[in-house]
Regions:
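CheY-like receiver
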Residues: 12, 24-26, 149-199
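Two-component/phosphorelay signaling modules centered on CheY-like receiver
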Residues: 40-59
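Alpha4 helix (beta4-alpha4-beta5 surface) of REC/receiver domains from two-component response regulators
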Residues: 47-48, 92, 106, 117-132, ...
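Helix N-cap/capping motif at the beta->alpha junctions
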Residues: 60-69, 90
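Short amphipathic alpha-helix used as the core "switch/output" element in two-component signaling
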Residues: 69, 91-105
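Active-site beta3 strand of CheY-like receiver
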Residues: 74-80
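Receiver (REC) domain active-site loop signature in two-component systems and cognate sites
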Residues: 85
Length: 199
């Protein structure tokens, strides 16, 4: 009895999971992503990950200044940004972008993807208004989880004193749960306490 009663639920769960996966797939396929990284090899690695998870519209910039111009030119749905770059580093780029009334696209979601994960960088990225902070090398699943979180649970942009960026996290997981998507875990950082600063 219990086994038979469980069968419809299992089937329904699989069907809901399939629908949810289709929705996520369509969302991911519809976005335009800008990769800003001075390392050509890393741009290729990130591009390959994005292609493998279904992203079709991908642009690249080799430094912060080129990244700013690209954001102005085509207003991507998401920016994946390195920290250490020539001419203009990632932190400086975020500071310029998060300037409503000055920069034309201040609300663009930003994922900081860097091999430099010292605690002060995580704190600084959070203060500057970065949406997510990930450590290189990143897995396809980790990157997909963050992208899905940004697409399905967009946090309102708020101004708090000198800060302009996504509202600090509270209860933003309900829309994801309705789609059958598990909320992402803490960012992949080298220091155990650093990830908590982004929550």
């Amino acid at each position: 009895m219990l086994g038979e009663a469980g069968k419809p639920a299992t089937g329904a769960s699989k069907a809901m999971s399939s629908v949810s996966n289709n929705r996520v797939e369509k969302l991911v396929q519809s976005i335009a992503v800008l990769i800003v990284d001075d390392n050509q090899y890393m741009r290729k690695v990130i591009r390959n990950i994005l292609v493998n998870i279904g992203v079709k519209n991908i642009h690249e910039a080799a430094d912060g200044i080129a990244g700013l111009e690209a954001i102005r030119m085509f207003a991507p749905d998401l920016v994946i940004l390195d920290w250490e770059m020539p001419l203009l580093n990632g932190a400086e780029l975020v500071r310029i972008v998060r300037s409503p009334g000055v920069f034309p696209v201040p609300d663009v979601p930003i994922i900081m993807l860097t091999g430099h994960v010292e605690r002060w960088r995580v704190i600084e990225a959070s203060r500057l208004g970065v949406n997510e902070f990930l450590k290189k090398p990143v897995s396809g699943k980790a990157l997909l989880d963050r992208i899905v979180a940004i697409l399905t649970c967009p946090r309102a942009m708020v101004r708090l004193g000198d800060y302009y960026g996504p509202e600090p996290r509270k209860l933003f997981y309900e829309p994801m749960q309705k789609m059958g998507v598990s909320p992402p875990t803490a960012p992949e950082t080298a220091e155990p306490g650093a990830a908590k600063l982004m929550v």
